[in-house]
């Protein structure tokens, strides 16, 4: 689905930025008859429900014309929330030392899910060091399907 999200990113990023928000990332979940398109936005102040509604209406108008996804889907515009999703290398860099849960595109040594602390980010190799209970592991950022911060209470 990377192609769909890349196409949508190219289409909506200038619009969202023009409205004063940052496009954090996009999740597209193809789920039978009704797929879900999640757009995560942020700003230097908190995101309100009203902000999400304004962006959603603007994007709906664009999607009605451009039709980047065939078939029916639900559009969700959201703030990143407390368990913030991480989409890009810069996101991992911003949250060094934070707990994360990672889900990989394919198993690594028989494991698809990882939990630990972001120890470091390599700009050169496009990898992160994840420090967990069993020690440190180096993971390729391009192989991470989904990543979220994990909050300890």
Swiss-Prot record:
Domain of life where this protein originates: Bacteria
PANTHER family for this protein: RIBOSOME MATURATION FACTOR RIMP
Taxonomic lineage of the native organism: Bacteria, Pseudomonadati, Pseudomonadota, Gammaproteobacteria, Candidatus Pseudothioglobaceae
Record-given protein name: Ribosome maturation factor RimP
GO cellular component: cytosol
Gene that encodes it: rimP
Family per similarity comment: Belongs to the RimP family.
Pfam families: DUF150_C (PF17384), RimP_N (PF02576)
HAMAP family assigned: RimP (MF_01077)
Segments crossing the lipid bilayer: none
UniProt source species: Vesicomyosocius okutanii subsp. Calyptogena okutanii (strain HA)
